[in-house]
Each structure stands twice: as structure tokens, then as C-alpha cells.
Amino acid sequence: MSFTRRRFIQATGATAAAAALPVRAQAGPIRVGLVTVKTGPLASGGIDMERALVQRLNERNNTMAGRRVELIVADSGGVPAQARTKIQELVERDNIHIMIGPLDTASALAADDYIRQAQLLTLSVAAAEDMTQRKPNPWFTRGTSTSSQSAMPLADYAAKELKYKRMAVIADDIAYGHEMCAGFMRVFEDAGGKVVQRMFPPLTVPDYGTYLAQLKTDIDAIFLGFAGSNGFRYLRQFNEYGLMGKVKPIGGMTALDEAVLRNMGDEALGIITSCWYSAEIDNPINQKFVSGFRAQWKYDPGFYAAATYTEAAVLEATLNKIGGKIEDKPAFMKAVRSIKVDTCRGPLSFDPYGNVVGSVYLRRVTRKEGRLVNSVIHTYPNVSQFWTYKPEEFLKNPVYSRDWPPAKNLES
């Protein structure tokens, strides 16, 4: 299926006619803009976002709530300023009704004010915490998770079930990595553990040798907060440096995504990660999704693919609730935050801030039919962005970052 960028130009008279004939206007196509990443270190996941969304639309014959759906795809390159420009083009040139995306936290933060200004309906994949916390964007809803939402259950599991006491954390030096590691550290230390080392390599660092040479070995494990293909690159060098038998790696939701797991070998076996999705989730919707995706692309869908497949399900459920009238933006936002919908990740709902409440899965890498998969070993149901903390108390603190919570147990 190919996509072409279309320009919709409205003359003043046409606009007036549309206002006079709302039913006829609503019978036109729903224009969905996908802002993803198809170049750079985040490209493997960004390409999967497009593939999965196209699959979902094809399954619905490109129709939702009785209206045709047109998809317009933009590549931000993972550059925040470019993402904002692409979003503005989608709104002002292509007249999209709704955006799915962007992929990365930094791009979502860069576009936050424009989303507000344009009142752009947004179903986000990006995990930027404060867009559904201290500075909630009224046009922004997220069916995936915040940066830390999957990391906090893993921290609980690491302390209470794996009995880890001393850990290091490493993540890309971007907001997503900072927020994820901060949430992990807070919960791990609240449960009695200590994070004794933190490292934040640049997103595009060509080699992790310097960081591997610095890694403490008198620790139980290291938490990996990488995005895109960086988790694969780090673990490959981690294994080459002979660290696999000395320090146990565990990872956040994108560290060993299926998009990169297919390129790994036995070094990945046994590694535990946490995510709101696994291709191994046993429900009919996911089975259909995985079988269709594998049939076309010859590998399992992961976080990024499931993100757009899930957001499309949220979009369809919301459109069905409002009779397809996506032009009524306040009605759409009220409806989307009130729905409960079954998806490939399981049932989900939304909190008053527009963020998802749903299951988080602990996964272990195993081999199945000759390929590596993220097998589910434990499920935390109904996880919110606030974990077990009271929302009002959680929101009194600063957003998770390199500076908060204070890293009080770091060792030189």
C-alpha cells in the first residue's frame, strides 16, 4: 500500500458551505497523520510503527465508523525540531484530523505547545511523562505508557523477586532515558535496593567501550534504558567484553524490542525485560495481529508495532462512540478518555490525565521455533503512570529526570 501527500485547499466559500452542511463534511475521509522515524538509531522501531498501522487499517478495509481513513506518513528523523515542523505541515498543509505519534519523548515535548495551539487530537506513542502529569495537554492521549510506567514494576520485581541489592543503570542521554531510569531507581531504592552507578551515553554514541570499561562488577545487575537499536548494540559489546557472566542485564520496554531481538543470538537468552506488550501475549486480538505481521514481514511485532496497532484500536473505539464525528474535538477527547477497549496488549482504560491504565508484563528471552521471543513470566495488572504512589503526592514532586529523585547511593 503506498501513500501520497495530499494538499487540501479550502476557499472561503467552501469553508462556509462546510459549516452549513456538517453532515456532508463528516461523510468525507478521516485524515490520520503518522509521525514516525525512518532514519537514524530509532528507525527500526519507527518503520514498525508504520507497518503495523497499515496492517490495522487494511484489516478494517481503511474504514472506521463508516468513514474512509486516509493515512499520511511523516518522517521526523528523531530530530525534535524537525518533528515539530512535520507536525505543523500535516496540520496546515494536509489538514489531518488526528495525529498518531510522535515516536520519541523529545519530539513530543518539542511539539507540545503547537499541539495545544492547533488543538490537534493526538494519540501518542511518545512517553513524555509531564504531558499527562504536571502539565497535562488537553489534546493528548496515550495508549502505550510513560517512560517509567513499565520500569517501575521491573524495579519492584528486581528487588522483591530477584533479590537484587546493588545495581547500575544506563540509558540514552535523552528525556526518555532519564525518566525511565529515575522511575526505576526510585522504586528499587524504596524497596531497599541501591543504585550505585548511573551512565547516560549520547543517543548516537558510536561505541560503548568507554562505558563498559567503567562498569562496576561488584553489583548484582544493570538496568538498560535504551531505545531503538541501542540495546542490541550495547549488549553485543557487553558480551564481547566478557561481562555477561559477571553482571546480569535487565531492561526497560525498548531495550530488547522484537524489532532488534531478531538480530541477536544466544547472548540474549534469559534476559528479563518489562513492557506493556509482548508478541507472546495470549489473546485473540494479539494472535491475529502477530500472525498477520509475521506473515508479511517474517518477524514478530514488538513495542513500536504494537503501539500504533493499539492506538488505532483506541481511535476506532472512540469514533464508534461519537458516531464518527471526529470534527467535534471536545467530544472526541471526552469520549477517548472514557473508553475501555480490548487490544493486542490486553484491556485498557485511561486515567483523568489521558494516560493509559493497563497490564505490564515481565518477559524473559527464550527460544521458540528457532527464534528469540520475549516470553511472559509475570503480569502486573492495571498499572497506572503513578505505580502504587498516590497521584496527588506523586505530582508534588518534580518530573523524573537526571536530577530527581536524587541519586543518594552513587559510588565513585
Residues of each region from the PLM?
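Extracytoplasmic "Venus flytrap"
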Residues: 33-56, 74-80, 103-104, 170-178, ...
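Extracytoplasmic ligand/sensor domains, especially the bilobed periplasmic-binding protein
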Residues: 96-199, 246-272
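Extracellular/periplasmic ligand-binding modules, especially the Venus flytrap/periplasmic-binding
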Residues: 183, 228, 233, 280-338
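C-terminal segment of N-terminal export signals and the immediately downstream linker at the start
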Residues: 1, 21-37
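Beta-alpha junction/loop-to-helix N-cap segments that form part of ligand/metal-binding clefts
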Residues: 44-49, 63-134, 201-206, 232
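Solvent-exposed, acidic/polar segments of extracytosolic/periplasmic ligand-binding ectodomains
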Residues: 337-412
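N-terminal secretory signal peptides and thylakoid transit peptides that target proteins
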Residues: 1-16
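Hydrophobic alpha-helical segments within soluble ligand-binding/sensing domains
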Residues: 83, 143-165, 206-209, 231-232, ...
